[in-house]
């Protein structure tokens, strides 16, 4: 964080604050984490760049979604239509993760599946494995909830196969409760 701030790297500064927020919140101090959100917002707003403002919105929405605080998420993220939105290209994979989580939390499984194709296309173009894994996990959860068991199993299998080679487990741990019925 200090190196990013000293060298005026706004994107890195936001990322460092986001990682600090995750650690603080996972250690059981959500109040401190929510306070750090204000710093992320201030850094982004002071930058004057839309890219950093979108980054801050997504970082904050990511954490709010895991604390069932969707009322605090920016409306453009909740209402989003990934095919029609102007999201800066570097943010598309992260947007897909956040938007998918919000759809799962809101039980908007059909809406998620309607956006799945365009988000997966973007994730594959940018070769973003984490995004691909999350998209497949959210598709497995959505299909399971829509009583499409074979499709749910296929999406879960795809997520596992994609994650296996690089040993990526976090998306499965974070979504374990919702995945319990899929496997």
PLM feature spans:
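Tandem amphipathic alpha-helical repeat scaffolds
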Residues: 2, 12-29, 52-68, 93-107, ...
């Amino acid at each position: 964080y200090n190196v990013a701030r000293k060298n005026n790297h706004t994107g890195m500064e936001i990322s460092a604050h986001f990682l600090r927020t995750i650690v603080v919140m996972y250690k059981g101090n959500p109040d401190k984490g929510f306070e750090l959100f204000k710093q992320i917002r201030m850094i982004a707003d002071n930058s004057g760049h839309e890219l950093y403002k979108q980054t801050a919105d997504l970082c904050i929405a990511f954490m709010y979604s895991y604390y069932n605080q969707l009322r605090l998420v920016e409306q453009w993220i909740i209402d989003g239509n990934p095919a029609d939105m102007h999201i800066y290209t570097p943010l598309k994979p992260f947007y897909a993760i956040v938007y998918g989580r919000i759809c799962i939390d809101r039980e908007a499984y059909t809406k998620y599946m309607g956006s799945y194709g365009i988000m997966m296309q973007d994730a594959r173009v940018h070769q973003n494995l984490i995004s691909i894994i999350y998209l497949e996990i959210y598709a497995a959860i959505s299909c399971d909830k829509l009583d499409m068991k074979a499709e749910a199993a296929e999406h879960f299998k795809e997520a596992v196969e994609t994650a296996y080679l690089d040993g990526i487990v976090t998306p499965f741990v974070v979504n374990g409760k919702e995945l319990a019925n899929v496997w």
